[in-house]
Amino acid sequence: MRARSTLSFAATLILATSGAVSAQQTSPTMDADGTIHAQDVVIPTSDLLSAQAKRLLIERIEHNPKFDPGPNLVERARAASLEMAQPVVKRWQEIYPATIQRVTMNGVPTDVIVPKAGIAAKNRHRVLINLHGGGFFTGGGGAAGQVESLPLAGAGRVKVVAVDYRLAPENKFPAASQDVEQVYRALLKTYKPENIGIFGCSAGGALTAQSTAWLQKQHLPRPGAIGIFCSGLMPGFWTGGDSSHVAPVLNRQLPYPAERIGEGMSGYYLSASDAKNPLAVPGISLSVLSHFPPTLLVSGTRDVALSNLLASNVALKQAGVETELLVLEGLGHGDVFLFAGAPEAKEADALIWRFFDKHLGR
Protein backbone atom coordinates (compact mmCIF):
# COMPACT_ATOMS: atom_id res chain seq x y z
CA MET A 1 0.00 0.00 0.00
CA ARG A 2 2.83 2.35 0.91
CA ALA A 3 4.62 1.56 -2.35
CA ARG A 4 1.44 2.33 -4.24
CA SER A 5 1.04 5.63 -2.37
CA THR A 6 4.67 6.52 -3.03
CA LEU A 7 4.27 5.79 -6.74
CA SER A 8 1.05 7.82 -6.89
CA PHE A 9 2.77 10.75 -5.15
CA ALA A 10 5.73 10.51 -7.52
CA ALA A 11 3.44 10.53 -10.55
CA THR A 12 1.53 13.51 -9.15
CA LEU A 13 4.78 15.37 -8.47
CA ILE A 14 6.08 14.73 -11.98
CA LEU A 15 2.84 15.92 -13.55
CA ALA A 16 2.61 18.95 -11.28
CA THR A 17 6.14 20.12 -11.95
CA SER A 18 5.86 19.50 -15.69
CA GLY A 19 2.79 21.73 -15.75
CA ALA A 20 4.63 24.55 -14.03
CA VAL A 21 7.02 25.23 -16.89
CA SER A 22 5.17 28.35 -18.03
CA ALA A 23 3.26 30.60 -15.69
CA GLN A 24 1.46 32.04 -18.72
CA GLN A 25 -0.27 28.76 -19.47
CA THR A 26 -3.73 28.12 -18.07
CA SER A 27 -3.93 25.02 -15.90
CA PRO A 28 -6.45 22.42 -17.07
CA THR A 29 -9.75 22.39 -15.21
CA MET A 30 -11.99 19.45 -14.34
CA ASP A 31 -15.77 19.07 -14.21
CA ALA A 32 -17.50 17.13 -11.47
CA ASP A 33 -17.81 14.13 -13.82
CA GLY A 34 -14.06 14.08 -14.46
CA THR A 35 -14.13 15.81 -17.86
CA ILE A 36 -10.90 17.76 -18.39
CA HIS A 37 -10.83 21.14 -20.14
CA ALA A 38 -7.39 22.17 -21.40
CA GLN A 39 -6.41 25.44 -23.04
CA ASP A 40 -3.09 26.59 -24.45
CA VAL A 41 -1.95 22.99 -24.79
CA VAL A 42 0.99 22.56 -27.16
CA ILE A 43 1.76 19.04 -28.39
CA PRO A 44 4.96 18.54 -30.41
CA THR A 45 5.75 15.50 -32.47
CA SER A 46 7.36 12.73 -30.46
CA ASP A 47 11.08 13.23 -29.92
CA LEU A 48 11.39 9.43 -30.14
CA LEU A 49 10.38 9.33 -33.81
CA SER A 50 12.89 9.07 -36.63
CA ALA A 51 13.32 12.10 -38.87
CA GLN A 52 11.63 10.21 -41.72
CA ALA A 53 8.61 9.26 -39.61
CA LYS A 54 8.28 12.85 -38.37
CA ARG A 55 8.27 14.11 -41.94
CA LEU A 56 5.66 11.55 -42.98
CA LEU A 57 3.54 12.35 -39.92
CA ILE A 58 3.55 16.06 -40.71
CA GLU A 59 2.72 15.38 -44.36
CA ARG A 60 -0.17 13.12 -43.37
CA ILE A 61 -1.61 15.61 -40.91
CA GLU A 62 -1.30 18.43 -43.45
CA HIS A 63 -3.16 16.39 -46.04
CA ASN A 64 -5.80 14.77 -43.84
CA PRO A 65 -8.82 14.37 -46.15
CA LYS A 66 -11.85 16.39 -45.13
CA PHE A 67 -15.26 15.26 -46.29
CA ASP A 68 -18.18 17.63 -46.10
CA PRO A 69 -21.55 15.91 -45.72
CA GLY A 70 -23.38 15.87 -48.97
CA PRO A 71 -24.05 13.84 -52.09
CA ASN A 72 -21.64 11.18 -53.30
CA LEU A 73 -19.81 11.00 -49.96
CA VAL A 74 -19.00 7.32 -50.41
CA GLU A 75 -17.69 7.86 -53.92
CA ARG A 76 -15.55 10.81 -52.80
CA ALA A 77 -14.15 8.83 -49.88
CA ARG A 78 -13.31 5.89 -52.14
CA ALA A 79 -11.51 8.16 -54.60
CA ALA A 80 -9.51 9.77 -51.78
CA SER A 81 -8.61 6.35 -50.37
CA LEU A 82 -7.29 5.20 -53.73
CA GLU A 83 -5.35 8.43 -54.24
CA MET A 84 -3.68 8.01 -50.85
CA ALA A 85 -2.88 4.32 -51.35
CA GLN A 86 -1.32 4.36 -54.81
CA PRO A 87 1.94 6.20 -53.98
CA VAL A 88 2.35 4.09 -50.83
CA VAL A 89 2.04 0.91 -52.91
CA LYS A 90 4.68 2.25 -55.29
CA ARG A 91 7.05 2.96 -52.41
CA TRP A 92 6.56 -0.48 -50.81
CA GLN A 93 7.16 -2.08 -54.22
CA GLU A 94 10.50 -0.28 -54.38
CA ILE A 95 11.44 -1.61 -50.93
CA TYR A 96 9.94 -5.09 -51.24
CA PRO A 97 9.47 -5.91 -54.95
CA ALA A 98 6.70 -8.43 -55.49
CA THR A 99 4.50 -9.91 -58.17
CA ILE A 100 0.79 -9.23 -57.79
CA GLN A 101 -1.66 -11.54 -59.51
CA ARG A 102 -5.43 -11.08 -59.53
CA VAL A 103 -7.00 -14.44 -58.62
CA THR A 104 -10.64 -15.29 -57.98
CA MET A 105 -11.11 -17.80 -55.15
CA ASN A 106 -14.55 -19.35 -54.80
CA GLY A 107 -16.02 -16.31 -56.51
CA VAL A 108 -14.14 -13.74 -54.40
CA PRO A 109 -11.52 -11.46 -56.03
CA THR A 110 -8.09 -11.45 -54.38
CA ASP A 111 -4.58 -10.21 -55.03
CA VAL A 112 -1.94 -12.90 -54.55
CA ILE A 113 1.31 -11.22 -53.58
CA VAL A 114 4.60 -13.10 -53.84
CA PRO A 115 7.97 -11.46 -53.06
CA LYS A 116 10.36 -11.36 -56.01
CA ALA A 117 13.10 -12.43 -53.62
CA GLY A 118 11.23 -15.73 -53.46
CA ILE A 119 9.27 -17.48 -50.76
CA ALA A 120 11.53 -18.64 -47.93
CA ALA A 121 11.90 -22.41 -47.71
CA LYS A 122 10.24 -22.52 -44.29
CA ASN A 123 7.23 -20.63 -45.68
CA ARG A 124 6.45 -22.82 -48.69
CA HIS A 125 3.50 -24.32 -46.85
CA ARG A 126 2.40 -21.11 -45.15
CA VAL A 127 0.20 -18.22 -46.27
CA LEU A 128 -1.16 -14.99 -44.84
CA ILE A 129 -4.60 -13.56 -45.58
CA ASN A 130 -4.92 -9.77 -45.56
CA LEU A 131 -8.17 -7.91 -44.95
CA HIS A 132 -7.75 -4.26 -45.91
CA GLY A 133 -8.95 -1.23 -43.99
CA GLY A 134 -11.34 1.47 -45.14
CA GLY A 135 -14.26 1.71 -42.73
CA PHE A 136 -16.00 -1.23 -44.44
CA PHE A 137 -16.93 1.08 -47.34
CA THR A 138 -13.63 2.15 -48.97
CA GLY A 139 -10.39 0.41 -49.94
CA GLY A 140 -11.74 -1.91 -52.61
CA GLY A 141 -10.02 -2.59 -55.90
CA GLY A 142 -6.71 -3.85 -54.57
CA ALA A 143 -4.53 -0.87 -53.62
CA ALA A 144 -5.50 -0.74 -49.93
CA GLY A 145 -4.80 -4.44 -49.54
CA GLN A 146 -1.46 -4.07 -51.29
CA VAL A 147 -0.43 -1.27 -48.88
CA GLU A 148 -0.78 -3.74 -46.00
CA SER A 149 0.34 -6.91 -47.78
CA LEU A 150 3.53 -5.85 -49.55
CA PRO A 151 5.53 -5.08 -46.38
CA LEU A 152 4.52 -8.36 -44.72
CA ALA A 153 5.23 -10.38 -47.86
CA GLY A 154 8.63 -8.72 -48.08
CA ALA A 155 9.54 -8.83 -44.41
CA GLY A 156 8.62 -12.51 -44.10
CA ARG A 157 9.26 -13.70 -47.66
CA VAL A 158 5.84 -15.28 -47.54
CA LYS A 159 2.81 -15.40 -49.84
CA VAL A 160 0.00 -13.01 -48.91
CA VAL A 161 -3.55 -13.21 -50.26
CA ALA A 162 -5.30 -9.83 -50.03
CA VAL A 163 -9.08 -10.25 -50.08
CA ASP A 164 -11.08 -7.69 -52.05
CA TYR A 165 -14.21 -8.30 -49.99
CA ARG A 166 -17.64 -6.80 -50.63
CA LEU A 167 -18.13 -3.30 -49.28
CA ALA A 168 -20.93 -1.29 -47.74
CA PRO A 169 -23.29 0.40 -48.34
CA GLU A 170 -23.99 -1.90 -51.28
CA ASN A 171 -23.53 -4.89 -48.96
CA LYS A 172 -24.30 -5.44 -45.29
CA PHE A 173 -22.94 -7.70 -42.55
CA PRO A 174 -22.03 -10.58 -42.84
CA ALA A 175 -21.09 -10.18 -46.52
CA ALA A 176 -17.40 -9.50 -45.84
CA SER A 177 -17.12 -12.41 -43.39
CA GLN A 178 -18.71 -14.69 -45.97
CA ASP A 179 -16.14 -13.59 -48.55
CA VAL A 180 -13.30 -14.32 -46.13
CA GLU A 181 -14.82 -17.74 -45.48
CA GLN A 182 -14.80 -18.56 -49.19
CA VAL A 183 -11.15 -17.55 -49.58
CA TYR A 184 -10.26 -19.51 -46.44
CA ARG A 185 -12.03 -22.61 -47.79
CA ALA A 186 -10.11 -22.28 -51.06
CA LEU A 187 -6.78 -22.03 -49.25
CA LEU A 188 -7.61 -25.00 -47.01
CA LYS A 189 -7.37 -27.16 -50.13
CA THR A 190 -3.64 -26.38 -50.24
CA TYR A 191 -2.65 -25.26 -46.74
CA LYS A 192 -3.17 -26.71 -43.29
CA PRO A 193 -5.27 -24.37 -41.11
CA GLU A 194 -2.45 -23.99 -38.59
CA ASN A 195 -0.27 -22.69 -41.43
CA ILE A 196 -2.69 -19.88 -42.32
CA GLY A 197 -2.54 -16.45 -40.66
CA ILE A 198 -5.10 -13.66 -41.00
CA PHE A 199 -4.43 -9.96 -40.40
CA GLY A 200 -5.88 -6.57 -41.16
CA CYS A 201 -5.79 -2.92 -40.17
CA SER A 202 -8.68 -0.65 -39.11
CA ALA A 203 -11.86 -2.13 -40.61
CA GLY A 204 -9.66 -5.01 -41.71
CA GLY A 205 -8.65 -5.57 -38.10
CA ALA A 206 -12.29 -5.61 -37.06
CA LEU A 207 -13.05 -7.96 -39.96
CA THR A 208 -10.21 -10.24 -38.86
CA ALA A 209 -11.98 -10.64 -35.51
CA GLN A 210 -15.40 -11.01 -37.17
CA SER A 211 -14.10 -13.60 -39.62
CA THR A 212 -12.44 -15.61 -36.86
CA ALA A 213 -15.79 -15.74 -35.06
CA TRP A 214 -17.57 -16.52 -38.34
CA LEU A 215 -15.27 -19.44 -39.12
CA GLN A 216 -16.14 -20.87 -35.69
CA LYS A 217 -19.83 -20.72 -36.58
CA GLN A 218 -19.13 -22.59 -39.83
CA HIS A 219 -17.28 -25.29 -37.84
CA LEU A 220 -14.10 -24.65 -39.79
CA PRO A 221 -10.70 -25.18 -38.15
CA ARG A 222 -9.28 -21.99 -36.73
CA PRO A 223 -6.25 -20.35 -38.36
CA GLY A 224 -2.84 -20.64 -36.76
CA ALA A 225 -2.66 -16.99 -35.68
CA ILE A 226 -4.33 -13.64 -36.35
CA GLY A 227 -3.30 -9.98 -36.25
CA ILE A 228 -5.75 -7.23 -35.29
CA PHE A 229 -4.18 -3.89 -36.16
CA CYS A 230 -5.47 -0.30 -35.80
CA SER A 231 -8.74 -1.63 -34.37
CA GLY A 232 -10.18 -3.40 -31.39
CA LEU A 233 -12.90 -6.01 -31.22
CA MET A 234 -15.10 -4.26 -28.66
CA PRO A 235 -18.18 -2.18 -29.66
CA GLY A 236 -17.04 0.75 -31.78
CA PHE A 237 -13.91 -1.08 -32.99
CA TRP A 238 -11.82 2.05 -33.54
CA THR A 239 -13.61 4.36 -31.13
CA GLY A 240 -14.17 4.34 -27.39
CA GLY A 241 -12.04 5.29 -24.40
CA ASP A 242 -9.50 8.07 -23.98
CA SER A 243 -8.03 7.76 -27.47
CA SER A 244 -11.35 8.79 -29.06
CA HIS A 245 -10.85 12.21 -27.49
CA VAL A 246 -7.07 12.53 -27.47
CA ALA A 247 -5.93 11.00 -30.77
CA PRO A 248 -7.99 13.25 -33.07
CA VAL A 249 -6.41 16.32 -31.47
CA LEU A 250 -2.95 14.81 -31.97
CA ASN A 251 -3.84 14.52 -35.66
CA ARG A 252 -5.26 18.07 -35.94
CA GLN A 253 -8.86 16.93 -35.97
CA LEU A 254 -11.79 17.56 -33.67
CA PRO A 255 -12.44 14.90 -31.01
CA TYR A 256 -15.40 12.60 -31.40
CA PRO A 257 -18.51 14.08 -29.77
CA ALA A 258 -19.39 11.96 -26.75
CA GLU A 259 -22.73 11.00 -28.26
CA ARG A 260 -20.99 9.61 -31.37
CA ILE A 261 -18.60 7.28 -29.56
CA GLY A 262 -19.44 3.81 -30.84
CA GLU A 263 -20.19 4.84 -34.41
CA GLY A 264 -16.82 3.45 -35.39
CA MET A 265 -18.65 0.22 -36.19
CA SER A 266 -19.70 2.01 -39.36
CA GLY A 267 -23.40 2.40 -39.88
CA TYR A 268 -22.81 1.75 -43.56
CA TYR A 269 -22.06 -1.92 -42.86
CA LEU A 270 -23.53 -2.82 -39.46
CA SER A 271 -27.03 -2.20 -38.17
CA ALA A 272 -27.88 -1.19 -34.60
CA SER A 273 -28.95 -4.75 -33.81
CA ASP A 274 -25.54 -6.09 -34.91
CA ALA A 275 -23.99 -4.44 -31.84
CA LYS A 276 -25.40 -7.32 -29.77
CA ASN A 277 -24.24 -10.04 -32.16
CA PRO A 278 -20.87 -11.60 -31.21
CA LEU A 279 -20.33 -12.56 -34.85
CA ALA A 280 -20.30 -8.83 -35.61
CA VAL A 281 -18.73 -7.64 -32.35
CA PRO A 282 -16.74 -10.61 -30.99
CA GLY A 283 -15.49 -8.68 -27.98
CA ILE A 284 -18.87 -8.89 -26.26
CA SER A 285 -18.58 -12.68 -25.84
CA LEU A 286 -15.77 -14.27 -23.84
CA SER A 287 -17.11 -17.63 -25.03
CA VAL A 288 -16.47 -16.68 -28.66
CA LEU A 289 -13.10 -15.14 -27.82
CA SER A 290 -11.99 -18.25 -25.95
CA HIS A 291 -11.70 -20.08 -29.29
CA PHE A 292 -9.48 -17.43 -30.89
CA PRO A 293 -5.93 -18.45 -31.89
CA PRO A 294 -2.86 -16.52 -30.70
CA THR A 295 -3.55 -12.87 -31.46
CA LEU A 296 -1.24 -9.91 -32.11
CA LEU A 297 -2.67 -6.44 -31.48
CA VAL A 298 -0.90 -3.42 -33.00
CA SER A 299 -1.62 0.28 -32.56
CA GLY A 300 0.14 3.61 -32.04
CA THR A 301 0.04 6.34 -29.42
CA ARG A 302 -1.71 8.70 -31.88
CA ASP A 303 -4.19 6.06 -33.05
CA VAL A 304 -7.85 6.74 -32.34
CA ALA A 305 -8.31 2.96 -31.96
CA LEU A 306 -5.72 2.56 -29.19
CA SER A 307 -8.12 2.47 -26.23
CA ASN A 308 -10.44 -0.06 -27.87
CA LEU A 309 -7.46 -2.21 -28.79
CA LEU A 310 -6.10 -2.11 -25.23
CA ALA A 311 -9.48 -3.12 -23.81
CA SER A 312 -9.64 -5.89 -26.41
CA ASN A 313 -6.28 -7.22 -25.28
CA VAL A 314 -7.61 -7.51 -21.73
CA ALA A 315 -10.79 -9.26 -22.93
CA LEU A 316 -8.78 -11.77 -24.97
CA LYS A 317 -6.56 -12.53 -22.00
CA GLN A 318 -9.62 -12.97 -19.78
CA ALA A 319 -10.85 -15.50 -22.34
CA GLY A 320 -7.57 -17.41 -22.09
CA VAL A 321 -6.17 -16.36 -25.47
CA GLU A 322 -2.44 -15.93 -25.93
CA THR A 323 -1.87 -12.33 -27.02
CA GLU A 324 0.98 -10.02 -27.88
CA LEU A 325 0.62 -6.24 -27.77
CA LEU A 326 2.67 -3.83 -29.89
CA VAL A 327 2.05 -0.09 -29.35
CA LEU A 328 4.19 2.15 -31.55
CA GLU A 329 5.34 5.49 -30.19
CA GLY A 330 4.18 8.56 -32.09
CA LEU A 331 2.32 6.73 -34.86
CA GLY A 332 -1.32 7.19 -35.74
CA HIS A 333 -4.08 5.19 -37.38
CA GLY A 334 -2.62 2.88 -40.01
CA ASP A 335 0.79 4.59 -40.04
CA VAL A 336 2.51 1.23 -39.53
CA PHE A 337 1.65 0.57 -43.19
CA LEU A 338 1.25 4.10 -44.56
CA PHE A 339 4.76 5.24 -43.54
CA ALA A 340 6.45 3.15 -46.21
CA GLY A 341 10.17 2.91 -45.65
CA ALA A 342 10.27 4.67 -42.28
CA PRO A 343 12.39 2.78 -39.73
CA GLU A 344 9.41 2.49 -37.38
CA ALA A 345 7.28 0.83 -40.06
CA LYS A 346 9.99 -1.59 -41.16
CA GLU A 347 10.79 -2.52 -37.56
CA ALA A 348 7.11 -3.09 -36.85
CA ASP A 349 6.71 -5.24 -39.97
CA ALA A 350 9.62 -7.39 -38.83
CA LEU A 351 8.04 -7.81 -35.39
CA ILE A 352 4.65 -8.61 -36.92
CA TRP A 353 6.21 -11.29 -39.07
CA ARG A 354 8.15 -12.65 -36.09
CA PHE A 355 4.82 -13.19 -34.33
CA PHE A 356 3.38 -15.14 -37.27
CA ASP A 357 6.60 -17.06 -37.74
CA LYS A 358 6.44 -18.10 -34.08
CA HIS A 359 2.84 -19.28 -34.13
CA LEU A 360 2.19 -20.67 -37.63
CA GLY A 361 2.84 -24.32 -38.36
CA ARG A 362 5.63 -25.39 -40.67
Feature names for model-found ranges:
Residues 1-9:
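Bacterial N-terminal signal peptides that target proteins for export
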Residues 19-23:
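Sec/Tat signal peptide C-region and signal peptidase I cleavage site
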Residues 66-87:
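Phosphate-/polyanion-interacting regions in eukaryotic proteins
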